[in-house]
């Protein structure tokens, strides 16, 4: 508000998640915490295992995180597309973004995950791509 105090807007989008789904859209409407999302990303980085528990088989994770598009077909944003996310054919990173400008990427080459979470609508991924670039520049280069 004008005094700098956080307030919940009327008709907040979170109310939509309490209603029964009328359209099933894969990950559409998926709600989680940053902590759980980071654990999910870490599980993918670990090849399907988290804290000693096997969640997915390693070949499944490798298939998920590799380009599945036929030769000659390119996903405009990153060049490739895995099973449930984009695959960057330039740097081998796998990830996805969400409606409220959320972003995650798994970088197996550099053994790291990067998450950038805002709750900004309409969707704008530009900040997250720049953030990812700066994180890699600071840590890897």
Predicted feature locations:
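Short, surface-exposed loop or secondary-structure junction motifs
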Residues: 1-89
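Short, well-ordered beta-strand elements
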Residues: 105, 111-120
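Short, surface-exposed charged micro-motifs
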Residues: 84, 103-105
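Residue-level recognition of short loop/turn positions
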Residues: 3, 109-110
């Amino acid at each position: 508000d004008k005094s700098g105090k956080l307030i919940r807007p009327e008709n907040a989008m979170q109310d939509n998640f309490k209603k029964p789904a009328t359209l099933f859209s894969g990950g559409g409407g998926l709600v989680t915490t940053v902590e759980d999302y980071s654990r999910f990303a870490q599980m993918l980085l670990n090849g399907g295992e988290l804290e000693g528990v096997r969640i997915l088989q390693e070949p499944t994770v490798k298939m998920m995180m590799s380009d599945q598009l036929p030769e000659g077909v390119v996903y405009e944003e990153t060049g490739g597309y895995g099973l449930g996310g984009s695959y960057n054919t330039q740097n081998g990173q796998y990830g996805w973004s969400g409606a409220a400008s959320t972003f995650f990427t798994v970088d197996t080459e550099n053994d790291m995950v990067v998450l950038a979470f805002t709750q900004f609508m309409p969707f704008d991924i530009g900040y997250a791509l720049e953030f990812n670039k700066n994180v890699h520049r600071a840590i890897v280069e």
